[in-house]
Design a protein with these regions (language model features):
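Conserved phosphate-binding catalytic cores of ATP/NTP-utilizing and phosphoryl-transfer enzymes
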Residues: 1, 13-51, 78-95, 103-105, ...
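Gly/Ser/Thr-rich active-site cleft segment
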Residues: 1-16, 20-25, 29-32, 126-174
Length: 403
């Protein structure tokens, strides 16, 4: 390799393999994070600063929110969190992603009380959905989309992979028999159930965070983003849905649009009013010098390093914290009320209330250091050909508009 390889990190940046292997926990969920960073880069290109990302693959669906061009980073991320499991707290900077077990390979099944469920168990890629003809016998979301003709069998994987409608219907038959409905209706029920699960995730990342989805543009990616995106956007009253070119590999493209990034955290609990400003400034100075030393070792000049400061604040007595931006340079006494007011606003945004009269404290001081690197040039694609030349054929598709 002519250039040194880098690893994608869960904080939305990249690092050398040597740096990444020192703290491997920083690579958790780094693949999906690439899609979020790609969506932010795409938004900058097309002048869309408010974006909801939705990445639907074979096993899971993941969503994140970009507000005013800023990707939300959290230290409260919990691995494998779901309604029945609290998850494993990572306590490292991670792009804020909500993940559910709903993807193309998610298996449709009937629970003990006779209710239709989709996921989280997945058929994966091997044997995969029944329609693959590789031995899978259980009905999946992909089988349902094929039965509803929302997937074109002639164009699956560019026409290189043949899928079987008969095998999909055979797998869906037990679901239809259980509810005494036809197979096509059962397939639509599977799709609706999966869409409802996905909608819950989208609401968690937007409405539950205090954001109105109608103020955002949706970017659908992954192998199933274009299949389910239109229905999800319609339910959320999102006016614009963008499907990037080659959505299945969009996360990889997003990785190419990242800078080097290092996150530093110093835990130091002290009240906002009457805090030791000399100590606070020393903490940030120490972290900045450490970052510069790391990047200098990697051949990055100080002129190409950009710092972003923040702090995790909370009302005294609280367990959870809220990240709040802190201005660069030496922090003075007159800066503290500004930081406190920003914290109150952020807390109200996240939890719908703030306690302006309550005492607040710093819990962590954070520094993000970006090392600027060259990125691919994005070329404008000019329209060519005629609409007639783009015609591929016709088929009847069940969109269930009346259901």
């Amino acid at each position: 390799l002519k250039e040194e390889p880098h690893a994608m990190l869960s904080n939305g940046g990249t690092a050398t393999f040597e740096r990444a292997k020192e703290v491997p926990i920083t690579m958790i969920e780094s693949g999906p994070v690439g899609g979020v960073i790609g969506a932010a880069a795409l938004g900058e290109i097309i002048d869309e600063e408010n974006i909801i990302t939705f990445d639907i693959g074979g096993t899971t669906a993941k969503t994140s929110l970009i507000n005013k061009g800023n990707v939300r980073i959290t230290t409260e991320y919990k691995l494998e969190q779901n309604p029945r499991f609290a998850g494993y707290p990572v306590k490292m900077p991670v792009v804020d992603i909500i993940e559910i077990g709903a993807g193309g390979g998610s298996i449709a099944w009937i629970d003990d009380v006779g209710v239709l469920k989709v996921g989280p168990k997945s058929a994966g890629a091997d044997p995969g959905p029944a329609c693959y003809g590789l031995g899978g016998k259980e009905p999946t979301l992909t089988d349902a989309n094929l039965i509803a003709a929302r997937i074109d069998p002639a164009s699956f994987l560019g026409g290189e992979f043949k899928v079987s409608l008969d095998l999909a219907k055979e797998a869906m038959a037990p679901i239809a028999e259980h509810f005494n409905i036809d197979i096509e209706e059962a397939a639509l029920g599977v799709i609706k159930t999966a869409n409802n699960n996905m909608l819950n995730a989208l609401k968690l990342i937007s409405v539950r965070r205090g954001y109105d989805p109608r103020d955002f543009t949706m970017v659908g990616m992954g192998g199933n983003g274009a299949v389910h995106g239109p229905f999800l956007a319609s339910e959320l009253k999102v006016d614009k849905l963008i499907i990037p070119n080659m959505p299945s590999t969009f996360s990889a493209w997003g990785m190419l649009m990242t800078d080097l990034r290092q996150d530093f955290i110093q835990t130091q609990i002290m009240p906002v009013v009457g805090c030791d400003l000399d100590r606070v400034n020393a903490i940030y100075e120490e972290m900045e010098q450490e970052a510069l030393a790391i990047y200098t070792k990697q051949g990055i000049s100080p002129e190409d390093v950009v710092f972003a400061r923040s702090a995790d604040l909370r009302y005294i007595g609280q367990e959870h914290t809220v990240k709040t931006a802190v201005t660069g340079g030496k922090i003075k006494e007159e800066d503290l009320p500004v930081i406190r007011q920003a914290f109150d606003r952020n807390h109200h945004q996240a939890y719908t209330f703030s306690l302006e009269d309550a005492a607040a404290e710093f819990a962590n001081f954070n520094l993000t250091a970006f090392g600027k690197v060259n990125k691919p040039d994005i070329k404008t694609v000019c329209p060519s050909g005629t609409p007639e030349a783009a015609y591929k054929g016709e088929r009847i598709i069940d969109f269930d508009e009346q259901g």
